[in-house]
């Protein structure tokens, strides 16, 4: 990806206390009202979750992507990205989030098992075998609990807890989107952008464009 690709593109989606989103080539010189967020270089990038080493603390640079329904592999956009702002969380809020993460993990495992037994489930439904369906459901629930226990209960690391309760971030995005960098200087600029006035579609009222320079060390 050449740095010129991004020059003149906009931060086209800005949500206060959440993130700023850019990298859509269609945003160059785009008039207000134009639908943005679907453009790219014509390819996606495989998901690369290095979690919990890299997580969504304030300033994290992450890849945007399409939703799970149409992108189950969670592949990243070839160009679109977002910079996290988020908020500071209380410890009890993070504990509640851990419980939600555990439930989400179990639901994901259960859904995978259901998919693996889809033919058997279809046969049982065709034959209206309610007892068989109930027996299979009980079996899948038991397998779900076993697999979830083997994986382990999702918990935030001490580093995450410290970051989310001091500088802030968006912990609910962890392990969902690829984090590939962070802002080392200029968080004050990110703050100004995330505070800018936006229109109904979350696009800034006054365009916020970017230029990019690749620095090799």
What are these regions, as identified by a protein language model?
Residues 1-217:
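Cyclophilin-like peptidyl-prolyl cis-trans isomerases
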